[in-house]
Structures are given as structure tokens and as C-alpha cells.
Amino acid sequence: MKDYQISQELSLLGEFSKKVRHYLHTIPEVSGAEYKTSAYCRKMMQSFGYLVVEYPGFTGFHADLNIAGNIKRVAFRADMDGLEMPDLTESEYRSVHENMAHNCGHDSHMAIALTAARFLAENQHTLNCNVRFIFQMAEEDMRVPGAEKMVEGGCISGVDEIYALHNDASMEVGSVKINDGIMSSWGAAWTLDIGGISAHGSTPQKGLDAIREAVRIIDDLDYIVAKKTSPFSPAVFGCGMIHGGTVPNAVPDYVQARGTIRSMDEETDSVLKNHLASIITESTLRGFRTTMVSTGYPAVINHKEAFQRVIQSASCFLQRIDSHCKPMTGSEDFSYMVNAVPDRKGALFFLGSGCAEKGINNYLHSNPYYLDDDCLLVGAQIFINLVTR
């Protein structure tokens, strides 16, 4: 039984929100190439009467509902990209795109935004602020920082406050998690390229073994996290991919490895980056052609006033609110948008999208990934309350 109550007016959009999510779930697209998704959302926002602003060369866009000139503007972010993995869900609306799935639930983020946007447009006579919905490309791939590109393109221009949510199917529908500080880690994706010298496997002294050097560097990176950072400041290092060598009886002359590194404070982030640079320098002095490219996101840090506004907007109809949750070790490029708003007035919160009774209790990026459609109106109600209460 539900322990929350959606407004009667918003409840009328329940079927609309489900239909939107189910369609978007069928067409997940890779980061930066969300063409069908973007076109669908743009057409929908235009039909509601929003002024749509596109970004040449990018799939992201924002849409404005303008009430008056000299009043504040509140913005909401919805990310659009899917993940490169098969959709293993058993539903009539499973992905029709091979090896693509919405296993991070961005389909729900867009459905929530579109539902809230429709409601606000139909009830704009009750608003006392301007509204912007930002449909962001490329949140998943740290090599293509979609939020940063959109900020550079002007998506935050004129914005006074900004909010975003992320679904979490390990939490029950009707619950929210947030805090008034760090919500996500400083995170970076790294790509390590090592060039050595090939030689016959019987004469290893004549070559420079790129695989052995990769193992040494990866081990050193693990050591940095374990021994060069404070035990009171968590950090996580991971290597998820290694490719190298061509035949079994030769010294390999090239290796590429890729992974991520994350931390929970800016000082630790700086320590990690400085040690990474010294490791690469040491490798080149050993004769290897070694480079490391690192791209990542700063942490999302919730503004205290924006945090309070989320609490107020959720607590008026929800009972299960954790206002002191621990930050996630994952990273979010929503930080670029928050940092671009005056006084950094913005907040990210987690929205329960699971349901134990329905057997929905899974983690982001797991496969299959299910979420409960009942979360859609809960998220939309919070967004609506943020601009109407």
C-alpha cells in the first residue's frame, strides 16, 4: 500500500508518463548520439509550448517556459543516453537497438521531466518563476562530458537554481535520499597507452615488454590509493580493460589499459593526479612511450538552500526521506551545471524506483535493470513542487 499521495491533477498524467518511458526505453542510444531520443523529447516540449534551444553539433537541448521577464528561472536536468549492453529485461518495451539498454534508468529521468514539463505548461498561470528543462546528452561517458559542453553552449545562462534527480531501484518508490554536502565523488576515466620494443620471446632482453610495464603501473596506481592517501578520505581505483600483444611468442610492444579513479575530497583528488603524473614520467625514463589521458567530473556539492527546498518539496507528500545520506562513490557531470549557477545553488537527489512486492530491487547498471513506473509521478511531483510551492 502506498504511503504517499500524488496530487489529483498530476495523477491524470500517470498513463502519459508510463507511455513516454516505455517508448524511450525501446530506443536507448550511445552517449553523444541520442538522435531519436532528442528528436522525440524536442517535439514533445514544443507541443507543450516551450521555446526549444538546440546546440549545433550536439544532441542536447534546453526548453524554456517563460512567464515574465525579471523573475528567477529554475532549471531541471534530465540525461538522455543509454548504456552499451544488451537489454535483458523481459518486457514488451525492451530495447530494439542491439547491445543498447537504459540500464541506468535515464528513460525514467526523461519521462519525469516531460511529465512535469507538461503539467507546468498546462498550469503556467499558477507559476511565479520561469522554468527551463535541460535534456543533456552524454552523461555516461567521461570522455564526452555532455554537461560541460552544454554549459559552454549556454544552458545555464539566466538560471538561478538547478535540480536533478537520479532513480535508484534499490530504494522503494516513495523514498528520497539527499544531503546538504557532497553527493558524488571526484571521478576520472583514464586511458593508459604504453609503447615498448618488440622482440622474439626467446630473447626478451632485446625488447621492452609493454605488458609487464602495464602491470607495474597498474600495481603502482593501486599502491597510491592504499598508501598515499588519507584513510579518512576514501578513494577507489579500478582497471577494467587491458589489451596488448599479438602473438604468444613475442615481447609485446604495445598495451592499452582503461579504468577509473575516484575520491571523496578535492585534496585527495589532487594527490592522486600528482602521483599519476610522476608514475608516467618514471615510465618514460625507463624507455617506454607512455601516456595517460584522464577526463572526469568534479563532485556534485549540494547547496544548503537548494537542499532545503528539495526537502520541503518532498516532505509535503512523502514520509521516507533520508536527509543525511552518504555520498555515492560514482561520479556525475551534473556538477558542471551546479558549479555554473550563481552561488552554485543546485541540488541532486536520489529517487526510489524499486518495489519489493514486485521483485524490483536492483542496482544501477545491473542487467536486467527494472524500475517501478510508480516512481515517475513521484519525481514529477517533486519537480513541480520546487516551482509551485
Predicted regions and their residues:
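Non-cysteine beta-strand/loop elements that form the S-adenosyl-L-methionine
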Residues: 75-77, 86, 190, 347-353
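Divalent metal-coordination and catalytic microenvironments
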Residues: 24, 76, 106, 133, ...
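General structural feature for long, well-ordered alpha-helical segments within catalytic domains
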Residues: 2, 13-16, 20, 33-44, ...
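Histidine-centered active-site/metal-ligand motif
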Residues: 25-27, 102, 106-109, 166, ...
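Acidic/His- and Gly-rich active-site-bordering loop/insert found
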Residues: 2-102, 107, 111-129
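Metal-dependent amide/peptide-bond hydrolase catalytic core
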Residues: 215-389
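Histidine/acidic-residue-rich, glycine-tolerant segments that coordinate divalent metal ions
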Residues: 62, 83, 91-101, 108, ...
